[in-house]
Regions:
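Conserved alpha-helix/loop element of class I SAM-dependent methyltransferases that forms part
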Residues: 3-20, 37
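Class I SAM-dependent methyltransferase SAM/SAH-binding core
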Residues: 25, 31-83
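A short acidic, Gly/Pro-enriched loop at the edge of an enzyme's catalytic core
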Residues: 82-93
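A short SAM/SAH-binding and catalytic strip from SAM-dependent methyltransferases
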Residues: 92-107
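A short glycine-rich, Lys/Arg-flanked "PGG" loop and its adjoining helix->strand segment in the class I
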Residues: 107-122
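Conserved catalytic/acceptor-binding region of the Class I
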Residues: 124-197
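Conserved Class I S-adenosyl-L-methionine
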Residues: 168, 182-261
């Protein structure tokens, strides 16, 4: 997802206007690209600690980012979003990109976020698809059915609350954790044919093959699955990504909460 969103993600980070030489925390850093871009934003005297819950993921992020600009200012560590391995009031800001909706105990995580941020610091929650994206232009009914199936599938991982619901309740979650939400920003990512390799790869492999793959097949009718396969399978002559007029629209929301001094 990082490369797919890179132009907009860099813009989002730039518009945060993070203080030069500040210290920040990236909770759920994934492959580490956001951590690199955050490190670039705070300059050569800034520092970013990037957390992932598993050693293998930390090692992968460290390996992927090695030698890239800003990598020497990023420390990758093992850490859980609900039990941060960071002292109280030790960072100037905290970034959590497309991760909070995965944490079942949201309030506990947000209270941990508030614990480690200095008074007056900011907690930035980035969530993709608070509003559903458009990946199948011209097929609104089928795409809605697929989206509903995807929502239902995430109920299990979300302990009875879908990822979509969790994303859409970020504001009340911040309030419940005692944080003042002062800013909410929305960005619309647009991609058109001919697609960049990173865009094509994300849409085909992450969206069509993984998110809309076998995991939701039993939640669609036979007809719906056949239509989905015709439009989404990589070997299909009707794959929408082959259309010279193909486009997708993908919304990103950013919630910025201030920790009161």
């Amino acid at each position: 997802m990082n490369r797919f969103q890179e132009p907009e993600a860099r813009r989002i980070i730039a518009e945060l206007d993070l203080p030069p030489a500040s210290r920040g925390l990236d909770v759920g850093c994934g492959v580490g690209l956001y951590a690199l871009w955050l490190a670039e934003a705070v300059g050569p005297a800034g520092r970013v600690t990037a957390l992932e819950p598993e050693v293998s993921r930390v090692d992968a992020a460290r390996s992927l980012t090695a030698g890239q600009p800003g990598a020497d200012r990023v420390e990758f560590r093992v850490g859980d979003g609900t039990v941060l391995p960071v002292p109280d009031q030790s960072v100037d800001w905290l970034w959590c990109g497309d991760v909070l909706h995965h944490i079942v105990d949201t309030e506990r995580a947000l209270r941990e976020f508030a614990r480690v941020v200095k008074p007056g610091g900011r907690i930035v929650i980035k969530e993709s698809q608070v509003l559903s994206a458009l990946f199948l232009p011209g097929h609104p009914e089928l795409e809605r059915r697929i989206q509903i199936a995807e929502i239902r599938r995430t109920l299990e991982e979300g302990a009875g609350r879908s990822f979509q619901e969790r994303r859409q309740t970020t504001l009340p979650a911040l309030r419940a954790a005692g944080l003042a939400s002062s800013v909410m920003r929305h960005y619309l990512l647009e991609r058109r044919a001919p697609l960049r390799p990173a865009d094509r790869d994300y849409i085909q492999h992450t969206v069509f093959s993984r998110n809309w793959g076998e995991r939701i097949r039993d939640l669609l009718t036979v007809t719906e699955w056949r239509e989905r396969s015709s439009l989404c399978e990589p070997g299909s002559p009707d794959n929408v990504l082959l259309d010279p007029d193909y486009f997708c629209l993908y919304p990103i929301s950013v919630f910025i909460a201030a920790k009161l001094a």
